[in-house]
Design a protein with these regions (language model features):
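Cyclic-nucleotide recognition modules
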Residues: 1-21
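Intrinsically disordered or compositionally simple regulatory linkers and C-terminal tails
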Residues: 20-28
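Short, low-complexity disordered segments enriched in Ser/Pro/Gly and basic
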Residues: 33-39
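Short hydrophobic beta-strand segments
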Residues: 39-45, 267-271
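Beta1-alpha1 glycine-rich phosphate/pyrophosphate-binding loop at the start
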Residues: 42, 46-73, 83, 127-194, ...
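FAD-binding core/adjacent interface of flavoenzyme oxidoreductases
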Residues: 72, 76-128, 144, 161-162, ...
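Rossmann-like dinucleotide/flavin-binding elements
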Residues: 119-156, 240, 248, 254-307, ...
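A Rossmann-like FAD-binding core segment of flavoenzymes
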Residues: 182-218, 222-225, 230-232, 286-401, ...
Length: 448
């Protein structure tokens, strides 16, 4: 028998054996999920917003869950009757012998201990955000012996984690799903002793003792950082159309996970947006849906989407691209049933059938914790390097003896990586490159 440290020592001494162990664990988990072993059961009507939120939290934290529609699945309806649970108490989450009635995402996160207990601890590097940039920083920092903590507001992977197939990422000739990339990256980071915490959001940055930075978290805990990486990414903008608020989580979504395609089987869906994420969602949904309409405000996809995705969309008989068009209204009872589209060229309005609308338009940086501390550009993205050096006003570079490093913000030792920084490439490879680069600069700062 090996304890945690013994197993880690063995894997370090025999890395080839370690690769087999990790691959075996991944394969074992995939088999268990396919067979339904250890899979949590989420019982709720199809249009339940709370069930959608819980499922999204679990799936994106790589925890196996299946949604059973109580209105169409007789076994789940019978289980509710047997447990004497009324429909008004749905969603119901069944995990082993535990049954949670109408739980919020926060209650599920607490029950499954997604948040790490780190109150008052000191770290060489604290990373805010666990998208590709944050995970890359965690892997490289941990592998180089830096004590690293990663706080992720929702779940690892970021926007890339919801991609069904990333085909232009180096080393994966047949493509890689965002879920697979996230799963392997989180395992890799933990292998190097990085502490990862989900559903854990930084709410404030402040001066700490001994020249460290204090990071206050949303559950009352705090950590101290010698260096900090802002890898908080960006969030999709909301669709401005009648009915959006009513159907959010009940027909209006910001990601197309693998389970969404299955739920869209033989149905009509709409994807709003012209970037790569929208293209990946459209091609994925087209494998199951009866029809997919891609709605874009611009005149063509070629200026905003990678060529390979444009080509695939044009070749799909199930995908229709509607340029210079916007969604003006959504209608339905408990879920979306139809969508009103407006042609911006001639003002013609048409109603089309749709059971789901996937919105992937624009993005706003997630910088709330750094408000009033770090300088931003006109769009709200963090200024780094020469941008930080040129920043004026009260948020400016304070050191006269050196310029900020390439990814360093106006605060020495605080870096930005990935989509949250000004001038980012908005590609997975670029974010991973940022994550690796900040570790190099962090070493220089720590060396003093």
């Amino acid at each position: 028998m090996f304890d945690r440290n013994g197993l880690r020592d063995m894997l370090a001494r025999w890395p080839e054996f370690g690769e087999h162990v990790f691959e075996t664990l991944l394969a074992r988990r995939a088999w268990h999920e396919a067979e339904g072993h250890g899979v949590m059961r989420l019982i709720a009507p199809r249009g339940s917003r709370r069930a959608f939120e819980v499922r999204d939290l679990l799936e994106r934290n790589l925890l196996p869950v299946r949604w059973y529609d109580v209105d169409t699945d007789a076994e789940s309806a019978a289980m509710l009757d047997w447990l004497n649970i009324p429909r008004s108490e749905t969603p119901v989450l069944v995990h082993a012998t535990d049954v949670m009635l109408n739980p919020s995402a926060a209650q599920v996160a607490r029950s499954l201990e997604l948040r790490a207990q780190v109150d008052g601890q000191r770290f060489d590097l604290v990373v805010l955000g666990a998208g590709p940039a944050g995970l890359a920083a965690a892997v490289y920092a941990g592998s180089e012996g830096l004590r690293t903590f990663v706080a992720e507001a929702w779940a690892p992977g970021g926007q890339a984690g919801t991609s069904t197939r990333i085909e232009n990422y180096l080393g994966f000739p047949s493509g890689v799903s965002g879920t697979e990339l996230t799963r392997k990256a989180t395992l890799q980071a933990r292998r190097f002793d990085a502490v990862l915490s989900s559903f854990h959001r930084a709410v404030e940055l402040a001066d700490g003792p001994d020249g460290m930075l204090r990071v206050d978290l949303d559950d009352g805990q705090h950590v101290l950082a010698r260096c900090l990486v802002m890898a908080t990414g960006a969030r999709w903008r909301e669709l401005q159309a009648d009915g959006v608020d009513r159907f959010r989580g009940a027909g209006v979504y910001h990601a197309a996970m693998a389970t969404d395609a299955e739920r869209a089987r033989d149905e009509d869906v709409i994807v709003v947006g012209g970037g790569n994420s929208a293209g990946q969602a459209a091609t994925h949904l087209a494998s199951r849906a009866r029809s997919v309409r891609v709605v874009v405000r611009g005149a063509a996809l070629k200026s905003t989407m990678s060529h390979y995705l444009v080509d695939r969309i044009e070749r799909s008989p199930r995908i229709e691209v509607m340029t210079e068009t916007e969604v003006s209204a959504l209608r339905g009872s408990s879920t979306v049933e139809s969508v009103t589209l407006l042609d911006r060229r001639d003002g013609v309005v048409q109603d089309v059938a749709a059971t789901a609308v996937f919105v992937m338009i624009g993005a706003d940086p997630c910088t709330e914790a750094a408000t009033g501390i770090l300088a931003v550009d006109a769009a709200g993205y963090l200024l780094c390097g020469t941008g930080a050096a040129k920043s004026d006003g009260h948020l400016c570079w304070p050191l006269p003896d050196r310029e900020p490093h390439l990814l360093e913000t106006v605060r020495p030792g605080v870096f930005a990586a990935g989509d949250v920084r000004s001038g980012a490439s908005n590609r997975v490879a670029g974010a991973v490159g940022d994550g690796g680069m900040v570790v190099r600069y962090a070493h220089e700062v720590l060396a003093g």
